């Protein structure tokens, strides 16, 4: 069974050009499905029936997985069997009459402008090369709304401080050129002037990566999560994640009067409906409501609304 799973994952990478993170999620979902089938004494894909897939769905629900997780795993199984039937490995798709579960779409959490300012000021209370780097990362993350995977993938030549722009490669290789505000530009300048060379000494070879760990290697997503967790604990923000900063960027942009389409382009959303969920949020959704955005939040991108549309490079 594993052989077919590996063939499917190669298909996702080579023919559908999915990202490594998406493929890793498919792998996790299908490995859990395989484990479930083995528990039912099933070891060949052509032996899997509609009832087996339905039992897997019921098992996920009984184990109280989030509706979004259940929907994702069912979608992975359905895609996998579409692949198997298309290759003639199985004759009949057992997922044909399995409906994708409805997902309860929770409103994303966003920080207040005051909480954002407190977070962005925290690293330099005890400046070290690492914390100067952290300051630059947090400023850039909030100023652009990039995903954490996009942040850690940035290279030095993606940053243009003369134009105050950052070139970002998003999902499916889509490129966005994003304006950055003065706070982010200053933090990046200080990182380049003070910290990056010191961090790079930890490695025996040069690297084009923008953000480096203490060994001089490219910082990973997991590494950034651990850094953010440390600052979250210092501020008492137990549920702070990288995506909360992305949500905060979107909410504060919209609350400051930016056009929905402009924010969609900045975030790299392919569908406007994904961006529209942020219109249901305002600063009252946080514990410390504000009538107006704080100064840093109000200049989130350092540009006026009509300048915010970011053309996608072909």
From Swiss-Prot:
Ranges where the Core-binding (CB) domain occurs: 1-85
Q: What is its main location?
A: cytoplasm
Q: Where in the cell is it found?
A: Cytoplasm
Tell me if Cell division is a UniProt keyword of this record: yes
Active-site residues, record numbering mapped to chain: 147, 171, 243, 246, 269, 278
Q: Which GO terms describe its biological process?
A: cell division; chromosome segregation; DNA transposition
Q: Which portions of the sequence form the region Disordered?
A: 284-314
Q: Which UniProt keywords apply?
A: Cell cycle, Cell division, Chromosome partition, Cytoplasm, DNA integration, DNA recombination, DNA-binding
Q: Which residues form the Tyr recombinase domain?
A: 106-291
Biased composition regions of type Basic and acidic residues, renumbered to the chain:
302-314
Disulfide pairs here are: none
Provide the Gene Ontology terms for cellular component: cytoplasm
The record, for Gene3D superfamilies, names:
1.10.150.130, Intergrase catalytic core (1.10.443.10)
- Which Gene Ontology terms cover its molecular function? DNA binding; tyrosine-based site-specific recombinase activity
Q: What Pfam families has UniProt attached to this entry?
A: Phage_int_SAM_1, Phage_integrase
Task: Family membership, please give it.
Answer: Belongs to the 'phage' integrase family. XerC subfamily.
Stated role: Site-specific tyrosine recombinase, which acts by catalyzing the cutting and rejoining of the recombining DNA molecules. The XerC-XerD complex is essential to convert dimers of the bacterial chromosome into monomers to permit their segregation at cell division. It also contributes to the segregational stability of plasmids.
Subunit (UniProt): Forms a cyclic heterotetrameric complex composed of two molecules of XerC and two molecules of XerD.
HAMAP family reported for this sequence: Recomb_XerC_XerD (MF_01808)
- For this entry, the protein name equals Tyrosine recombinase XerC
């Amino acid at each position: 069974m594993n052989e077919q799973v590996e063939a499917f994952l190669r298909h996702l990478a080579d023919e559908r050009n999915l990202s490594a993170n998406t493929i890793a999620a498919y792998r996790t979902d299908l490995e859990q499905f395989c484990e479930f089938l083995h528990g039912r004494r099933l070891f060949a894909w052509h032996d899997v029936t509609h009832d087996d897939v339905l039992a897997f769905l019921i098992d996920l629900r009984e184990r109280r997985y989030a509706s979004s997780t259940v929907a994702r795993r069912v979608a992975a199984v359905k895609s996998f069997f579409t692949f198997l039937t298309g290759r003639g490995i199985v004759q009949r798709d057992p997922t044909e009459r399995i409906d994708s579960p409805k997902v309860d779409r929770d409103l994303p959490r966003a920080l207040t402008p005051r909480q954002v300012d407190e977070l962005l000021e925290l690293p330099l209370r005890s400046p070290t090369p690492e914390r100067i780097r952290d300051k630059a990362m947090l400023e850039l993350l909030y100023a652009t709304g990039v995903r954490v995977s996009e942040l850690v993938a940035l290279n030095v030549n993606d940053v243009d401080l003369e134009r105050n722009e950052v070139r970002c490669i998003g999902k499916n290789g889509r490129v966005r050129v994003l304006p950055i505000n003065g706070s982010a530009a200053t933090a990046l300048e200080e990182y380049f002037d003070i910290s990056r060379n010191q961090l790079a000494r930890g490695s025996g070879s040069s690297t084009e990566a923008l953000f480096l760990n203490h060994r001089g290697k490219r910082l990973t997503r997991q590494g950034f999560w651990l850094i953010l967790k440390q600052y979250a604990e210092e501020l008492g923000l137990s549920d702070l994640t990288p995506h909360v900063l992305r949500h905060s960027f979107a909410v504060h942009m919209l609350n400051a009067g930016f056009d929905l389409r402009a924010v969609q382009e900045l975030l790299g959303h392919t569908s406007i409906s994904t961006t529209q969920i942020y219109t249901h949020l305002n600063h009252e959704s946080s514990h410390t409501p504000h009538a107006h955005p704080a100064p840093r939040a109000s200049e989130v991108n350092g540009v006026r609304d009509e300048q915010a549309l970011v053309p996608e490079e072909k």
